Amino acid sequence: MYGLPDRLRPLSAAEEQVMLAVWACREPATRRDIDEKLRGKGWAPATVLNFLYRLEEKGWVKSGKQGNHNIYAATVTQRAYGVWSMRQRLDTLFGGDLAAAVRALGSESGCGQSELEQAMKVLEEKHLEAEEYDLYDPYG
């Protein structure tokens, strides 16, 4: 899965919400910490616990004990998941064509001039990094 360990299985939309809560907590987090981040969802503590159990089975979190409490920590960073998730969407919706995705975002997403300029700056920086890498001679 694009830079993520092969042992990981895809997340459902609800599991993704729980992972966002785990990432938002200081690690390791207790179920109560995670519940607090999910307060607006209206989920019962047992529901959150069930999601955490499934996430552990899928390899997304690991659990342990701290005193009387179970604690949870993500096994993957939010950034790594974000990159993987965006790559999946890019492949699924745009056939892997980054330029088509950028055109669609620029023309139909309501991005303001400031956001577009910021995106251009990032793309230019990445382009320069790629050029530097291409010019690198490990033997010279």
Which residues does each predicted region cover?
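Conserved segment of winged-helix/HTH DNA-binding domains
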Residues: 77-102
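Short alpha-helical segments that sit at the start of domains
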Residues: 1-19
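Short helix-capping/hinge SLiMs at alpha-helix to coil transitions
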Residues: 9, 22-28, 41
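Short, cationic-aromatic polyanion-contact patches
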Residues: 10-14, 66-85
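Glycine-centered, phosphate/nucleic-acid-interacting loop/turn motifs that mediate DNA/RNA or nucleotide
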Residues: 59
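Short acidic, hydrophobic short linear motifs in intrinsically disordered regions
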Residues: 28-37
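Short helix-coil junctions and helix-kink-helix linkers
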Residues: 36-45
